[in-house]
């Protein structure tokens, strides 16, 4: 499929541009200390990075500290939101680059959707203890979700009003664009999607979120992926087959699909999951969250990530953090959208605003090349009423 290849190519190209420039969030008052610290960290790690990369797992390198299943109780979840944060920008070894920068942005008052970071120590423990977690983690995650609920005013798994939906993303110390996994719109099931539809009075939006969630979760967490005998990704094949049958055009733009189309595709997705896994798609939001966290930690040791770390001398024992964050939506209609932005041109370093966006889309659409993205300079023209 040309479209699928274009998406993958676009993701790689866009991800490479966005590898590092996006996370400069410290204030002018802190600039000098941050620079000194960054220099110190680079000097301290230069020798380690210069050495040949040893093919070891996190468990081997840190086994003496985390090999016991009765590890010492500690703090594993660091929250942020509403102008407060448990962490800060200097904590990248523990919180990963994304988590540390989100915490710093919250601390300086930027409008960051609330969330929490599960630290890299949990990743170390995960690999040292047969993919299990510290006993304290579940309670700390529940406290983190409760904090997001309080700030956003929605409840996780609520089937009576607007439900809290969350995004689960990786966050290594050094940026590894496109190498690990992301799940969006987590928390949807057959009941909460109806609540979302009623609360927003936007059926297409609600069912589009559910379709996206099943597709991402099925791929990343449940392993419903292309078999050696198949030419295309199975979920994409389902979508294109439906478009051909219902509309006579397998390459119809996704935004042209209505709520009834999306409902039909979702039923086919569920059948695909049952056929490939032998189990129904999980409906319990907490089960969904636990599966997503495990999948992100698992993606630290996938083939893509291993090859990338070898190329850029990133030690395996660093591990990745996991960021759990309240969803904001760019797919509610033509007055919403998603994009990426930089305070400098990522290709040249020139001090000019640079970005690209798509209307009526979620973030993965921009990096995957689902539709041609538009330059950031066009935002004012297309959305003149935006602040």
Locations of regions flagged by a protein language model:
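N-terminal beta-alpha lobe that positions the nucleotide/phosphoryl donor
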Residues: 2-20, 24, 28, 40, ...
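Residue-level signature of transmembrane alpha-helix interfaces in integral membrane proteins
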Residues: 125, 131, 194, 341-342, ...
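Beta-strand scaffold of nucleotide-dependent catalytic cores
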Residues: 323, 334-370
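Short intrinsically disordered coil segments
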Residues: 94-96, 338-339, 371-374
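Conserved helicase core region in the C-terminal RecA-like lobe
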Residues: 326-327
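Catalytic phosphate/nucleotide-handling subdomain of diverse soluble enzymes
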Residues: 361-387
